[in-house]
Amino acid sequence: MKKFINDPFDFVEELTEGIIHAHPDYYRAENGDLRVIVRQDAPVKGKVAIATGGGSGHLPVFMGYVGKGLADGACIGNVFSSPSAGQMKRVTKAIDSGAGVLYLYGRYQGDMMNFNSAAEESKQNGIQVETVVVSDDIASAPPEKHDERRGVAGIFFAYKIAGAMADEMASLDEVKRVTQKAVDNTRSLGVALGPCTIPLVGKPNFEISDDEMEIGMGIHGEQGVERVKMRTADEIAANLVDRVVNDMPFVAGDEVAVLV
């Protein structure tokens, strides 16, 4: 796969630096750290702050959802790799106004380990921290193990809900409660057509034939639930929607928000 790229080791810093230069009114790198990105006006007085983060390679997540009505800060790891606990602590300190910080991120082992470590140390330093972990990917675990599922595109709704509640100056407990309710009612499912190439690896992260697709593959190339021959757009949409609907206890009259 051909790329416009300089040194792969500089990829993440050049990426975040470019976005900051393009949007200087929205972002800043905290103390010059291009892995610790916060909204330009952080901390916002009296408001619960939303902290997020994860590996690079998923734009616009995570940095793209830092801003008014969304997250207040994000820590950025290498491509498909978790940011460090130290970066998470620096984000937490930079955005906390005294009203507390909600950690909001997808369920991946490395992210959970480092965010949990950052939360404990931040609490020891006098910052209130609560956590909501997004777990919307129905392909990664059965319904009875919803809280073990991976967090993927459904985090968009969590950002919007948490950000809106925080902007209304709700308490940390209330922001957490409403955001958790949104996460509990979010489902997603994806389909993969081809691999990506991680800059530092230099080769595709999985193999799939040109005439195949894989339903439910994870965003890092984790095995999905079914590999089949390519289908039409209508057939793919029907397949995904049926699986999502069957995973939720819908009743007549329910209203849903849809993200494609």
Predicted features along the sequence, with ranges:
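Short glycine-rich or small-residue beta-strand-to-loop segments that form or flank ligand, phosphate
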Residues: 2, 48-55, 71-74, 100-109, ...
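Short, acidic/small-residue loops that bind anionic groups at enzyme active sites
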Residues: 74-79, 123-148
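Flexible, glycine/charged-enriched surface loops at secondary-structure junctions
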Residues: 23-34, 169-178, 188-198, 246-257
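Glycine-rich oxoanion-binding loops at beta->alpha junctions
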Residues: 58, 67-98, 245
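Glycine-rich phosphate/diphosphate-binding loops and the adjacent beta-loop-alpha structural elements
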Residues: 203-236, 240-260
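N-terminal amphipathic/basic leader segments beginning at the initiator methionine
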Residues: 1-50, 210
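Internal, active-site/partner-interface "lid" segment
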Residues: 140-149, 159-220
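Gly-rich Lys/Arg/Thr-decorated short loops/hinges at beta-loop-alpha junctions or inter-strand turns
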Residues: 45-53, 62-75, 139-142, 213-229, ...
